[in-house]
């Protein structure tokens, strides 16, 4: 992968930085692993907006990614690496020895032709998946399950990883990129290495239209609204916020804790670092 700074041939391309990956497959994705994707545009089942600034964008197919990696003991060959419009990471198409094909999140350094395997006897090599009880302490991992057999839920985005810190009884401690240390059951599976496409965070979109292609709509400032629309709205001429920054519903937007999931508090050993 390489970063390419685009020549400023127009105002929209000035400052644009692209991530170029010449090793990605240029053809169509594997048709058997595609599903129809219906855009909700940030609406719930009642048609009410639950996530603002969503809508439009290019049509996409959903790529069915294998987050369970439960074909134990069967080697799989990497057929190709592909772009996935639904996530920041790239995906890899695996062809198993029995002929089945599955997509996985492509780890850093994975090459076409490599052989991957999952299970308790899999070697400690990037892309292989094992239960956490079989992974050495200090290993860098990604695609971590939170409930055994449910499928990977943590460390799945581009460049993400975690470190296996310790094992105590039936639980292990995993340190995430945010600094949070979390307890995970040792029967949960994780993949060795870190997620690829680590330069994704260095790209510069360049123009608003590119965000519209991705289904992201403009964000309007609260101070530019009317008082009925936002707590910061109203006033004669240009005015400041006149109060602490809040959301449209009055919730403080600077450092206010909104976590409600008390059920899993006992799984967090150390809170994430404050920015």
UniProtKB/Swiss-Prot annotation:
Residues 229-244 have a biased composition (Basic and acidic residues). It comes from Bordetella avium (strain 197N). GO terms for biological process: cytoplasmic translation. Coiled coil: none annotated. Part of the 50S ribosomal subunit. Forms a bridge to the 30S subunit in the 70S ribosome. This is Large ribosomal subunit protein uL2. Pfam families: Ribosomal_L2, Ribosomal_L2_C. InterPro entries: NA-bd_OB-fold, Rib_uL2_dom2, Ribosomal_uL2, Ribosomal_uL2_bac/org-type, Ribosomal_uL2_C, Ribosomal_uL2_CS, Ribosomal_uL2_dom3, Ribosomal_uL2_RNA-bd_dom.
